[in-house]
UniProtKB/Swiss-Prot annotation:
GO terms for biological process: positive regulation of microtubule polymerization. The modification Phosphoserine is found at residues 30, 135, 146. It comes from the Eukaryota. The modification Phosphothreonine is found at residues 41, 102. One of its GO terms (cellular component) is microtubule associated complex. Belongs to the MAP Jupiter family. GO terms for molecular function: microtubule binding; structural constituent of cytoskeleton. This is Microtubule-associated protein Jupiter. The gene is Jupiter. Residues 123-132 have a biased composition (Polar residues). The keyword Cytoplasm applies. It is found in: Nucleus; Cytoplasm; Cytoplasm, Cytoskeleton; Cytoplasm, Cytoskeleton, Spindle. The keyword Phosphoprotein applies. Residues 133-146 have a biased composition (Low complexity).
């Protein structure tokens, strides 16, 4: 068992000394827990959704004139920030000058021609198709170059839609049928899932 002398410093040296930490009320020094009314001061809340199109920059007067960083000094207001247009009084009052209205391009419209619709088929003029000459096909893929060559040579195919399969002849010879091995009939596996699954919209 430890002696009294080993633990006497715990309480004997702290006797008579007040604690230096002062507890404060959760509401601060002026909180009143008994419910008396206190003077209400309105809070200054900045409206972040307010528009400042027609007003001058009010934050510029409150910010410092010199901004320091990485051994450089920038004077705010000397040059406009990147990405912002300089604002003068004429453009603030009357807006920007009127620009000619140009028709927008329909980016969702497909450029792939289907069937014999003359509106969707590209124009063929002087051996050029869509800005490409008939002899240049090295940069395009094999599928697009073969369709371009068909269009250039005047062999526009109108048998059907290659995506959905509508309009093709039942006994067409567009594809090469594989030879049957060992003289047996070919077994078609109906349980196969197409690439991309059935939700791809192609099947």
């Amino acid at each position: 068992m430890a002696t009294y002398a080993a633990f006497k410093h715990v309480e004997l040296y702290n006797v008579g000394k007040a604690k230096k930490r002062v507890l404060r009320a959760p509401g601060g020094v002026s909180s009143d827990i008994f419910g008396s009314e206190q003077p209400q001061t309105p809070r200054n809340v900045k409206n972040l959704m307010a528009s400042n199109i027609f007003s001058a920059d009010t934050d510029a007067a409150q910010k410092n004139n010199v901004r320091q960083g990485a051994h450089r000094f920038y004077y705010i207001g000397e040059t406009p920030r990147r990405g912002q247009k300089p604002v003068d009084s004429y453009s603030r009052l009357f807006g920007e000058p009127a620009r000619p209205i140009t028709p927008s391009k329909n980016h969702m419209k497909s450029n792939i021609p289907f069937g014999q619709n003359p509106n969707t088929a590209p124009l063929i003029s002087k051996g050029n198709y869509n800005g490409k000459s008939g002899s240049v096909s090295s940069a395009s893929s094999s599928v697009s170059s073969s369709t371009e060559n068909l269009k250039i040579n005047g062999g526009v195919r109108s048998e059907g839609n290659p995506v959905t399969g509508e309009g093709y002849k039942a006994g067409g010879t567009d594809y090469i049928q594989p030879a049957h091995l060992n003289g047996g009939s070919q077994v078609i596996n109906k349980n196969r899932v197409p690439p991309g699954g059935y939700s791809s919209g192609l099947w």
